[in-house]
Swiss-Prot record:
UniProt-recorded name of the protein: SsrA-binding protein
GO CC annotation terms, alphabetical: cytosol
Record has Transit peptide as a keyword: no
Gene name in the database record: smpB
Cited CDD domains: SmpB (cd09294)
MF (Gene Ontology): RNA binding
C-alpha cells in the first residue's frame, strides 16, 4: 500500500512590488529558473527577494540578474553568491520574440513574482515592460488615493 502524501507547505509567491509601480506592464509570461538544490530550499523558506532584479538576453539565453537568494543555513558544501546570475528557461521561439520586441521598442524584462507551481517547481513570472515617467508615477499615486477614499466612504455608508 502506498502512503498518503502529506501536503507540502510552500511559501507564498515572492512579489516584486516596485515593478508594477515603476513600469507599464505590456505582456507577461512564465519561465522556469535554473537553481541549485540549496537555493531551492532557501526559496521555500521565503529567503528570496526580487527587488531591483531584472532579466536580460545574452547570447540567445535569458538571464535573471540581482535576484537575492540568501544561502541555505544548513548547506556546508559550498558558499554561493546571493546575487549571482541565474538562467531562465524559455523556448528558443519565446526568446527570439522577446529579443525582437526589446530591440525594436526599447522595452525591458522585469520579473514580477516567483512562485511554486502545483508540482512544486519554482517559476518566475517575467514581463515586457516600459519605464514610467515621473508624472505617470504621480498619477498612479493619485488614483490609488482616490480609490482608497472611495472604499472608506463605502464602508461608512
Amino acid at each position: 500500500m502506498s502512503k498518503k502524501q502529506q501536503p507540502q507547505t510552500f511559501v507564498q509567491a515572492i512579489h516584486n512590488r516596485k515593478a508594477r509601480f515603476e513600469f507599464h506592464i505590456l505582456e507577461t509570461m512564465v519561465a522556469g529558473i535554473e537553481l541549485l538544490g540549496s537555493e531551492v530550499k532557501s526559496v521555500r523558506q521565503g529567503k528570496a527577494s526580487l527587488n531591483e532584479s531584472y532579466a536580460m538576453i545574452h547570447h540567445g539565453e535569458v538571464w535573471l540578474e540581482n535576484m537575492q537568494i540568501t544561502p541555505y543555513e544548513h548547506n556546508h558544501l559550498d558558499t554561493l553568491e546571493a546575487k549571482r546570475s541565474r538562467k531562465l528557461l524559455l523556448n528558443r521561439e519565446e526568446i527570439r520574440k522577446l529579443e525582437t520586441k526589446i530591440n525594436e521598442k526599447g522595452l525591458t524584462l522585469v520579473p514580477l513574482k516567483a512562485f511554486f507551481n502545483n508540482r512544486g517547481i519554482l517559476k518566475i513570472e517575467i514581463a515586457l515592460a516600459k519605464g514610467k515617467k515621473l508624472y505617470d508615477k504621480r498619477e498612479t499615486i493619485k488614483s490609488r488615493d482616490a480609490e482608497r477614499q472611495l472604499q472608506q466612504l463605502k464602508k461608512t455608508y
